[in-house]
C-alpha cells in the first residue's frame, strides 16, 4: 500500500519553510533541491524538518491545505518543531 506524505522543508539559506504533499518523499525533496520548483529554487538547499504519513492522497492534501491556510495550525506545528 502506498503512503502519502505531508512535509515541511526548511531552507538552509534563509528563514523560510515550505509545506507540501507527495507520494514519494525522497524524490520530491531531491526535486526541490535541484531547483525544479520555480517559486522556491532561489532558496535551495532545503532540509527535511518534519513529515506526516497518510493512507490516502485526499487525507494528505487536506492536511497540507489545513497547514497552509490556517495560521494557528501552522504556528502550533512550528512551535512543536522548535522545542
Located regions from the model:
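GIY-YIG nuclease catalytic motif and its immediate N-terminal context
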Residues: 1-44, 48-53, 58-68, 72, ...
Amino acid at each position: 500500500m502506498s503512503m502519502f506524505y505531508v512535509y515541511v522543508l526548511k531552507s538552509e539559506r534563509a528563514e523560510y519553510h515550505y509545506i507540501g504533499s507527495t507520494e514519494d518523499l525522497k524524490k520530491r525533496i531531491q526535486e526541490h533541491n535541484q531547483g525544479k520548483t520555480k517559486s522556491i529554487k532561489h532558496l535551495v538547499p532545503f532540509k527535511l524538518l518534519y513529515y506526516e504519513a497518510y493512507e490516502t492522497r485526499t487525507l494528505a492534501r487536506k492536511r497540507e491545505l489545513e497547514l497552509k491556510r490556517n495560521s494557528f495550525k501552522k504556528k502550533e506545528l512550528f512551535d512543536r518543531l522548535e522545542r
